[in-house]
Amino acid sequence: MSEGGGLRRARHPPVWLAFFVATSLLATLSLSVSAQVAGDTIPTDSAPRDTLLVPIPPEAVGGDTIPEALRAEAASMAGMAEIPLMPGVGAPGWGSARWEWGPEELARLPGLTVLEFLELLPGMTTFRPGGFGRPIGLTAMGMGGGRVRVILDGFEMDPLGANAFEIETLALLDLESIRVERSLSEIRIEIRTFRMPEPEPFSTVELGTGVFQTRVLRAILARGFGDHSVATGAFDLGSTGGIGIREQYRHSSAVFRWSAAPAPGSGLQLEWRRTAIDRAGTVYPRETARTDLVVRGRQELGDRITTEALVGRAFEEDREAERRLEVTQGALRGIYSAPSFSAEAAIRGRSLGEGGAPLAGSEAEARLAWLPTSSFGLELASRRMAGSDLSAVDSRAMAMMTPIAGFTVFGSGEFGSRLVPRVEHQPALPSGSSGASGELVVADATGWRAGAELAAGASAVGVAAFATGASPSIPFGLPFDGDGVPVVVERSTGLETYLVAGVPRTDGAVRLEGWYTYFPGEAVRPYTPVDLGRAALVFQGVFFEGQLEPILRVEGVRRGRARVFSAAGQPSATAPVSHRLNLSLQIRILDVEAFLFWDNLLADPAAIDLPGAPAGSSRIVYGASWRFRD
């Protein structure tokens, strides 16, 4: 009965869909009526202004009746402060291949996880998707596996038991901003956690449900204590019965963070984070629990320098393989930030516990961005990694020039090598389990990228050519390619473009946006599709002075044919061509938001190509979130 019920819900959209469509129509009608009323002429007041002013003697004014206790509490809350921010180095944009989402942008993105947000960015793609809750690999620009770094408030979320951290398990409501830098040798994801927007207590609750018994529950609560301390707690729970209600999955993420700013420009923070994954069924079952403990301190030195010191420990227990992985990490970094120049220097050290993943024992990194004029910019970066009697250095340089307003040309180059983790611990077949083993691999990190961008108002178009020498190609270290052997590949070239254009006569409310990446020739490099792209039509309106905001997005996604590592460890399998049509609708009224995410509307079976998993089907999730203050 449960299986049949799940399939019936997949074929017939829920009643909520009709509710959302009706709400959108009502919003449109309300807009028309509002515009008509706004156009009417309201007569001005014809009464003469009162010119009589009666002064009130000071002695006639009564004293303030606000109790002293309330006055002290208000003054305390007005002076409440979080720990200092660590500013980013380098401006986001097409030329720098760097993108950043703040709190408002994150609230408007369609998707249930951070991983789904990242797929929206140019060149980003996933491989071996098996549906919500199954293992999945993220890559870009022909890099292969092992090239994703996740840095959470300065603490790098080291992968334990795989080549990349499972970013889809992060608690969404606990994220303040996401900054993504896509070079030709790695994907660097810098995440800033939640900060109180106002002194008053703040909380948000989000509930969602959908087909295949999908459930989403999220919550966050933050409030101040005393003069200069803030406590934040967040919880994120996602579960599903899987396609056909046969592959149950559940993950939970809990976060507690205490921040203290005893003096202006200084702060101390303690953070505890625990993530549990329970993947049942027959397609790569897994039951793990990961805990991260971090202590960080920050200090501003003047108006432009901010320093940070942190130490943290991460350990993971895998009940399927009966192993424990752990790593201890310490880091020091400093950032200088000025309008025309910014620089960052950082060192990081690790102590690997027994059974830990292969990671660099020490790292040193320096980055700078120089903008002497509004028409010229230069960025330089270098990083040294050492571990397991190996070392590698990779460097990058980028220049941008704007000869005329709105037109920018850019070029970047990378050279050197880097250490890439290779883990082969997980079962080659779904029915088995094994212990962890792995090694560090010295991989080439050379390549170049050059192109141009033309921007006018809210519209922009950009093109770029690139070449990557990232070799060897490393598997993701996930169950479907855990026995994969690194493969030496030749240099690959490609072309990419993006477009954002407002639709005429819509006052910017309707826009087209998309991107496309093309690799000429046959799909030879593993995890590198012949082509991939996204195209979307987006409506975003703001009505009644910001009290009503509907967002409707319809997009098509294509991923071309690509070679992938098979369970036998060789890049001999082929991922099929996939076409998906997605729809998302979000309606915010004041502090309440309703959402509907309908992925793979046409049920393309190739949307899921994980070995052993059922064919792709539509996924419908809908729900609402409430934001509370005080």
Report residues per predicted region.
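Outer-membrane beta-barrel translocator/receptor signature
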Residues: S185-E190, M196-A254, P264-S266
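Transmembrane beta-strands of outer-membrane beta-barrel pores
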Residues: L207-V211, L237-G241, W272-D278, V311-E317, ...
